[in-house]
Amino acid sequence: MLTVADLLDLNDTIAADLFAGKTYPWEALEEIGDYIRRLGPTLPPEEFDHPAEDVWIAKDAKVFPSAYIGGPCIIDHEAEIRHCAFIRGSAIVGKKAVVGNSVELKNVVLFDYVQTPHYNYVGDSILGSHAHMGAGSITSNVKSDKTLVVIREGTEQVPTGRKKVGAILGNYVLNPGTVIGPHSNVYPTSSVRGTIPPHHIYKNEHTILPKK
């Protein structure tokens, strides 16, 4: 359940080629910035503005004046970047995605229709299409002891080789290296670690139920 094919629909992102040849989604994290620098100059100028170095913004995206957008960054069609959003760089924001008030992004891919609407931090993470983060949700991306992040699925442990891995397709409060399968839900106030299968409901660490 940890592979790109298991977790992500590459038809729902401008960054599909970023994941080519990769087994696990987090393998793309170290390449996001360079990928943007390659892709940006190829985007049609009649559709994308180029307001700053390594920044490309679709002409039909809505960007509030108080938002900060640092490069490298691509903001795709009809995305909305709201008041005081802080994009630190190496960020791809998908079609019709929402980056809300005081949300901070760093080294991320938001697939199409992702919503990070209220006071979220998303770092070193990949959020699949239609993923929604509740108000105040964060993706912790560094372990307290600074050791390399390991993804856990049951008894299996998959080393990432990285000190910084946030969440893959995640929402709510997530610990480093959290993976949540498509169409799963997490109860508010949860602290999630490890892997949640597709089509499940996470109530707490002892209660993970299949959707009916």
Q: PLM ranges: what are they?
A:
Residues 15-17, 101, 110-113, 117-212:
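Glycine-rich hexapeptide-repeat left-handed beta-helix
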